[in-house]
Amino acid sequence: MPHTLWMVWVLGVIISLSKEESSNQASLSCDRNGICKGSSGSLNSIPSGLTEAVKSLDLSNNRITYISNSDLQRCVNLQALVLTSNGINTIEEDSFSSLGSLEHLDLSYNYLSNLSSSWFKPLSSLTFLNLLGNPYKTLGETSLFSHLTKLQILRVGNMDTFTKIQRKDFAGLTFLEELEIDASDLQSYESKSLKSIQNVSHLILHMKQHILLLEIFVDVSSSVECLELRDTDLDTFRFSELSTGETNSLIKKFTFRNVKITDESLFQVMKLLNQISGLLELEFDDCTLNGVGNFRASDNDRVIDPGKVETLTIRRLHIPRFYLFYDLSTLYSLTERVKRITVENSKVFLVPCLLSQHLKSLEYLDLSENLIVEEYLKNSACEDAWPSLQTLILRQNHLASLEKTGETLLTLKNLTNVDISKNSFHSMPETCQWPEKMKYLNLSSTRIHSVTGCIPKTLEILDVSNNNLNLFSLNLPQLKELYISRNKLMTLPDASLLPMLLVLKISRNAITTFSKEQLDSFHTLKTLEAGGNNFICSCEFLSFTQEQQALAKVLIDWPANYLCDSPSHVRGQQVQDVRLSVSECHRTALVSGMCCALFLLILLTGVLCHRFHGLWYMKMMWAWLQAKRKPRKAPSRNICYDAFVSYSERDAYWVENLMVQELENFNPPFKLCLHKRDFIPGKWIIDNIIDSIEKSHKTVFVLSENFVKSEWCKYELDFSHFRLFDENNDAAILILLEPIEKKAIPQRFCKLRKIMNTKTYLEWPMDEAQREGFWVNLRAAIKS
């Protein structure tokens, strides 16, 4: 029994491992370029079967805990390996030994508590390494990165356990584009640990406390170009004179991101910034100012000099006691050299006139996403305010009047670029006043319904996209770029009103087509973006867009954004791929051709009818059909005559003087029906013929040259033939009065030809001795 249980357990383990391996393989997908993706696939290990074809492997967000020496052994061409957010706690020493081509390695947010330099020694091509978020306390016992001579981006540290930076940690690294250190809980920093790196383009430093900030600053000031401080509480920061006497600082940009600061500590920070002689740009993102703007300091503290700072950026600044905030007048003197200021989404509603006047060098001012209205803007743009200002951005504020906004800015003599997008203007007056040097105006997303002469004619660039415009008819002689996407325009603007236009972006409007003539009318146009419209793919439009090879150079969004909206059977297809049928593209020519063909057919039919007596046949058929449609007076036939005699009027003498005498004077006499004698006067002749034939037992045809020339004889012959067909009897008797060659019989007498081929006929003898026999045979035929 125990043996059986043991076998069952072994089989269960084998099956479980088999299923796990199968699941691992199913969770990994690779394309033909060797890019393999297996993120978030619940993998418990690195899939087996990986070969040298794999160039990129993403196994992030799985449950991998262990990497063995054999897992990646065959991946000799692997260039990128992403193992972030797994549960990796162990990596064998030679796990990466075959990855000499690896350039990107991400081991962040795992459970690696000890780092080994043996992992990284084979990675001679590595340019990116991320070790963030692992619970190690230090960066190993020996230098981890000394062999990574090509490393450009390095990210190390964690929020909780990384407490110590040692001098050996970054030994061997001479140049880095980016170095990110999460030293949120840093407690020990060995002097000159970061000084070994000769040049770092961008250093990102996470520090909760500022205790070791000055020491680190001393080491990096001569090697870092951009220093970024994150998640730091500087409320109690105090600057102390540095013992180094550094004068060759390389720092050009200092960024504070998610930093807490007070009125007093801000002054201390500015003292620190005074040590950076080459500082050009200062940035505060998502910071909190726990103060009221009381920056008044003692005489001993007046050592602040903004130096060469040209750019100041403040985004999403939070001031809890905003309602108590001061007027910043103590800082006015520090702003005279600043050229670029951005204060975005920080609840700014006013720039005091005095501050505006102190900003003498300011060329660029961005006050986007604030609370500015026309009345306060007028105070900000007072006389002598912003004398050098060229670009003013007031995007997404509370401006409501274009006329007032333009008048307010008249004091800014050098202003050339104005962005007042995402304000709610709704309407536009007929005329406005603007600074006379205006070149650029952005009115996108302002809910305007029309454009008027309020737009300055000096503009070179105009953006009115994402509004409710259905017409653009402004004369802007100097305009070079027009952005008018996401409106309701149904056609391109008039080119004669925009003679200098180089760029036109008019996508996502209501345009259905445009022609070569329209585009050619824009003589200077270099770039057109017209995708996203509902194009009617007519033959003319398709021919123009598909045959003009140079069009692709002008249409920057061609062909992906040019889709047909109609005809319905090509809706959604790219314009360049649509092909219409000949009938759709040449309808006029096709109809004309069909009309010509129909005319020729009618003409040919007429000629054939004339040549082969078609009209005569039609008349005869019509008469027959009319006669057949008439109701019969009695269900049974009333035979009144022994024979109806069909003959030509020119053969009347033979019929009346010979035939009638022989048959009607015979005993018993035969009763014959002759048209001259027995037709009812006033009755339609066709009806007389039909009635006489139907009331006669037989029909006698007196054939001669005269007979075949008679139209009425032809009728009588045809009606007799129809009767023969309808009643299936032998009612026709042919008398050949004179010899007739069948070739001489006209084609329209096809019935006569057929009867002569199938029936025996009586021939009138020229010898009088034989005539008695002729009459005997005729009488016998009539009686039969």
Swiss-Prot record:
GO cellular component terms given for this protein: cell surface; cytosol; Golgi apparatus; membrane raft; nucleoplasm; phagocytic vesicle membrane; Toll-like receptor 1-Toll-like receptor 2 protein complex; Toll-like receptor 2-Toll-like receptor 6 protein complex
Domain TIR: 639-782
Site (Interaction with bacterial lipopeptide): F349
Residues in the Extracellular compartment per record: 21-587
Modifications the protein undergoes after translation, according to the UniProt entry: Ubiquitinated at Lys-754 by PPP1R11, leading to its degradation. Deubiquitinated by USP2.
GO biological process, one term: cellular response to diacyl bacterial lipopeptide
Disulphide connectivity of cysteines: C30-C36, C353-C382, C432-C454
Subcellular location: Membrane; Cytoplasmic vesicle, Phagosome membrane; Membrane raft
Glycosylation sites: N114, N199, N414, N442
Bilayer topology annotation: Single-pass type I membrane protein
Quaternary structure and partners: Interacts with LY96, TLR1 and TLR6 (via extracellular domain). TLR2 seems to exist in heterodimers with either TLR1 or TLR6 before stimulation by the ligand. The heterodimers form bigger oligomers in response to their corresponding ligands as well as further heterotypic associations with other receptors such as CD14 and/or CD36. Binds MYD88 (via TIR domain). Interacts with TICAM1. Interacts with CNPY3. Interacts with ATG16L1. Interacts with PPP1R11. Interacts with TICAM2. Interacts with TIRAP.
PANTHER family: TOLL-LIKE RECEPTOR (PTHR24365), TOLL-LIKE RECEPTOR 2 (PTHR24365:SF17)
Function summary: Cooperates with LY96 to mediate the innate immune response to bacterial lipoproteins and other microbial cell wall components. Cooperates with TLR1 or TLR6 to mediate the innate immune response to bacterial lipoproteins or lipopeptides. Acts via MYD88 and TRAF6, leading to NF-kappa-B activation, cytokine secretion and the inflammatory response. May also promote apoptosis in response to lipoproteins.
Protein name, as recorded: Toll-like receptor 2
